[in-house]
Curated annotation (Swiss-Prot):
Modified residues (Glycine amide): G10
Species of origin: Squalus acanthias (Spiny dogfish)
The keyword Cytoplasm appears for this protein: no
Function: Stimulates the secretion of gonadotropins.
Disulfide bond annotation, renumbered to this chain: none
Family that this chain belongs to: Belongs to the GnRH family.
Modified residues (Pyrrolidone carboxylic acid): Q1
GO cellular component terms given for this protein: extracellular region
Name of the protein: Gonadoliberin
């Protein structure tokens, strides 16, 4: 998956 939460590069 690909999102912007802070801990995942998105």
């Amino acid at each position: 998956q690909h999102w912007s939460h802070g801990w995942l590069p998105g």
